[in-house]
């Protein structure tokens, strides 16, 4: 029996022991900023406010245990439709999946319960699947949606020299429409996670840098949320700080937009709002910030302005991206 199954059975035995004393409670670790989780929240059947969450958690644990014993996988959507009266919404399944990850200290990919992939990719990339299928991005007329389960990718083949991640789908589509592969002299792979990336997108980027030895660059908005997205790719998600193995790219190169470039944009910048400043303070409190990233966040605080990638879209493909990559202008 594997470790996951044993941990789930341990949780079940503890719950049964508590039930003898009339206490139907599950302990779920809270988010942490490091590898040690010391705080828990109690999800109790005895409490009307958390009774539904308790039932969905039990449902999720039972399905994960079944997967570990029998093999296979479920989708978030499939789990919802298996018992819609209990679950009530797919978002409840997504929340319970993350809670189970915290309880078992693992990533969603390891559970075998999969969410639809958000990531899009274009360029020189061939994904050789374990079932024999080949997903060749160069053969598609448009972008290729990344597979839901990246662990079913047996091998990745590419002649690309690097990976370029862009924060938003709109920028991804704009670059393709401007023939970014034709105007740039070097072969590369273009990826977007459509904002905050899912585990699948982060896993693919990790594998490209580790297995294929490609450099990875990222282009995000010059605002605190863009910086946070860059940090998710680089260091992992705060909500899953307990399990980032295979999902991070520490050597990720941030080519822009840098807040220090905002003064040169002129009319392309807008004022920060209260939520932006709160996010900046949250990010500055992190202990994994590189000095250059911290300095750029301080710049945001000083100028009280932010800018989107679209503000430089007209010269992004011919000037901005090639200049940043060829001259190593990254943080």
From Swiss-Prot:
Compartments reported by the entry: Nucleus
Pfam family, one: TP6A_N
GO cellular component: nuclear chromosome
Catalytic machinery residues: 81 (o-(5'-phospho-dna)-tyrosine intermediate)
Gene Ontology molecular function, alphabetical: ATP binding; DNA binding; DNA topoisomerase type II (double strand cut, ATP-hydrolyzing) activity; metal ion binding
Keyword Isomerase: yes
Role, per record: Required for meiotic recombination. Together with mei-P22, mediates DNA cleavage that forms the double-strand breaks (DSB) that initiate meiotic recombination.
Family statement: Belongs to the TOP6A family.
Full protein name: Meiotic recombination protein W68
Taxon lineage: Eukaryota, Metazoa, Ecdysozoa, Arthropoda, Hexapoda
